[in-house]
Amino acid sequence: MWWGYSAPLDLRCEIEEKEETSKSLEVLIIGASDARHIIKTLASSYKHSDCSIIYHIIEPTMEQVARSILLLSTCLDKDLGLQEATRYYLEIMGNTLLRPATAKYLAKHSKLLADTVTQTIDCPWLNLEKLKHKDRDQLEWIFKFWERATREGVPIVDYWDRRIRKSLKTRYDYRDGVFDWDYHMILKPRGHSNLTIHEYRFWRNNGIAFTWIEGEPARSNPTLLNNIIPLGDGFLHYAYLGDITNGPFFTWALNEEKENVKLRATDIAEREVMRVIHEIRTKEPFCEELVAAHRDPSILNGIIITEMPSSEIEYESWTKYNKYEKQSVPWISIPSTKILFHPLSTLDLLKNKAEYKEKFDTIWIAHNMTKQLPNIIPLLKKKGHILIELRKYLSELRKEDLESFTKELKSTAQVCGLREIKSFNSETHTIAQFCSN
């Protein structure tokens, strides 16, 4: 729900260069959750010819829209150091608890983003005009809730533990054995070579995926909560409803290259996020030495955090930050990029609108949105590419489930008039590629 299960893609590589599409491109992304494809494509722009791109984004919930905006904004924040921005991004994306510095940034930045929704502060790359007024109101509530919940604390680790107890039932007391089984018998054979058992087990127990020697996570991450509704002077929200079996290790931490150096999934993710932020800022290739200095091989066989912080720290209230200065707009300039969010309800409507017929050069679809294929195909240009996320890294699915998904997807694609670019199956691939006839 809060992250994807496939590596970030440079979407320019998926578009066949043609004269009529070389200066302006339209891309539709459905259900990606974490803006990784936009970030990767932005970072790789210096490798391609100059081109303006409009990204049209559809997410199932407004909380996912808000997280996408926050994660994009963090990567584009020119006031942050390179490693600082990288770790803020990874912690906010995948940890139930944040380091104090990250939590302070989240509280301050949430206030800034709430002001961008109301257009008190201008955000040049963000376009919310397609959202309904109630959606924009909800988006503003979410950012305000994050700012307040980060200061006041929410019991997210307790929410996490309740989910684990409900899921495992009588096996809860033997949960480490369950986690080890899922790791060794399911995830490891599927090919994630850098995810260590210590990282995976610690995340399954507590929801903390990415850890470093410098600083311990102690403040709750409210961006992982959903169904946020204002009530009087406060807010109502659901407890944690996201993924508790797979983890945020299958996007930036996926490493397809064979390396002699053994690294944790955290190290790979940090390197790849640092790479894209560096390339967005400098439009130059990334130097590996920028990230290698702090690594210690001894951490491979252990975890950096040995015990969870006291819940009193998680709930400790902070004072409210002063209003963000209006003239302080922190984003890097990306003049050739616009990011346009649409409400989920438009998926059923766009195919009937003339201006969207054969509009998009490339469409990317999450694994849980494939039922929408019949609504999406009319939006794709002739010879355009459609990319569909597969379910390789969903540990709750067995071999027969993956085979069934592959078979059903191929059948649906054929009925919709799509042609496979490369043969695929869900056991060995993370993306299926199709082309319109």
Predicted regions and their residues:
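Domain-level detector for long C-terminal conserved domains
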Residues: M1-N437
